[in-house]
Design a protein with these regions (language model features):
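Non-catalytic terminal and connector segments of soluble metabolic enzymes
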Residues: 1-180
Length: 180
């Protein structure tokens, strides 16, 4: 099934000069770049990219608790309200997204969402396999990010589902051109 997905090379990825390498990896996997731009995200774009919904906030809260439990660490007591926690994380995500120029691109191909996610690797750079974008280029960790009360800097964002890709593409691109 031919799909479109959104990829953002985050500020640390742009600063490290890996834009061409990221694009080359997608193209070597027979994926097409059908939208591409460099942008300094506005507050409005960051809000639209990271909307706080009850479902997202609850999922985030549960994942965070599970992560601490796996490490054998008691999670810090922040709040029992997932929406309050979600809004705090959203503010960190937005701050990071707006901290520098990013590259936004739409990638098209057969099973593009799944293939891009495999090429990108785990969101946790320590768990990302060698040969994935995060495994090769990320140097951050959740432990360090948590200790500094910020989001992890893992160089790249990729939509996690076809539905999420549709929503995110609409945030970043008003028009796409098929050139092939």
């Amino acid at each position: 099934m031919i799909e479109d997905t959104l990829v953002l090379i985050k500020p640390e990825g742009v600063q490290r000069g890996i834009i061409g390498e990221v694009i080359a990896r997608f193209e070597r996997a027979s994926l097409k770049i059908i939208g591409l731009k460099m942008v300094l995200p506005s507050e409005e774009i960051a809000d639209a990219h990271y909307p706080v919904t009850e479902e997202w906030a609850t999922s985030l809260t549960n994942k965070t608790r599970e992560s601490y439990t796996k490490k054998g660490v008691t999670p810090p007591k922040v709040t029992d309200d997932p929406m309050v926690y979600g809004k705090q994380i959203q503010s960190w995500l937005k701050k990071h997204l707006k901290s520098g120029v990013i590259v936004a691109m739409v990638v098209r191909g057969n099973c593009a969402v799944e293939i891009v996610r495999k090429l990108v690797g785990s969101t946790d750079p320590k768990s990302a396999a060698a040969g994935t974008i995060r495994g090769d280029f990320s140097i951050d960790s959740y432990d360090l990010a948590d200790s500094e009360r910020r989001v992890i800097q893992n160089v790249i964002h990729a939509s996690s589902s076809v539905a999420e890709a549709r929503r995110e593409i609409a945030v970043w691109f008003s028009k796409l051109v098929t050139y092939y």
